[in-house]
Amino acid sequence: MRFRQLCIGLVILSGSLSAMTRAAPLPAPYLSITTESSAPSSMLGDGRVVGIATDKIRVVMERAGVTHDITLLPWKRAYAAALQQANGCVYSATRTPEREALFKWIGPTDEAQWVLMGRADRVWHIASLEDARGLRIGTYTGDARDSYLRSRGHVVDTSPHDMLNPPKLLQGRIDLWAASWRAGSDVLVRNGWDKQIVPVFVFNRVAVYLACNRAVPDALVKRLNAGFETIERDGTARAIERRYERRATSR
C-alpha cells in the first residue's frame, strides 16, 4: 500500500514539475550593441544614443522582444567588442569580403556615400579615384574606407579618430579626407568648417549593417532580418529617415 502511494505521489510530483517547466517563460534574448558617434546614424541626444540606424534598430529589437543596450565607443573598440562578446553586435558596419565570415549580418540598417573632402581654397580635378592617386588621404583606424583605399594602393594617413582629420586637412597635413557624406557634412557644419572644407568626389556607395558575433543564434538573426524587411515595407524606416532629414534642414 505504501509503495503504491509512493508511486502515485511521484507521478503527481513529476506531472507538477513538468507543468511548471512548460509554464515557465523563456528569458528574452539580450544583445550588447556598440557603435561609434557618427551623426546622423548614431549620436548622443538627451543622454541616450539616437540616430537613423539607431532608431531603426531599436524598433526592430522591440518588435522582436529582444532586450538590448547600445553603447557609444570609438570605432576600434566598438568593433572589437562585437568580435569578442558572444552576444555582441556593432553598427554601422560595411559588409566587406574581409569581414563577411567574421559576423552574422542583419539589415541593411542604412546606406552611405563615401566621399573625398578637400579644402575649398584648392582647385580640384578629380573625376575618378585614380585622379587622387599620389595625394595623401586621411582615414581612421579600423574604418572600411581605410582598408578600401589601402587595397587600391592609395597613400593613406590613418588617425586614431575621424574627428582629427578635418583639422589635419586645414593644416595641410593631408590633401583629402575620406569620409561618409552625411556624417562628414554634419561634422563640418557643427564645427563651422563647412565653408573651408567641401565635397570633392563620391568614390563609393555602400549599405551598412548590424554585424553580430558568430555565437548569436541563427534563429534570432533570421527574426531580426525579417524585422528590417518589415519596417521597410510598412514605412517605418522611411518615417525615421524623414524625421532626421527635417532636423538637418531646420538648422
Task: Enumerate the predicted regions with their spans.
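Ligand-binding clefts/hinges and TM-proximal coupling segments of bilobed small-molecule sensing domains
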Residues: 19, 67, 144-160, 195, ...
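Periplasmic-binding protein-like
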Residues: 35-37, 112-115, 189-225, 229, ...
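Short helices/loops that flank or line small-molecule/ion binding pockets
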Residues: 62, 71, 76-88, 104, ...
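Extracytoplasmic small-molecule ligand-binding "clamshell" domains
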Residues: 24-102, 139, 243
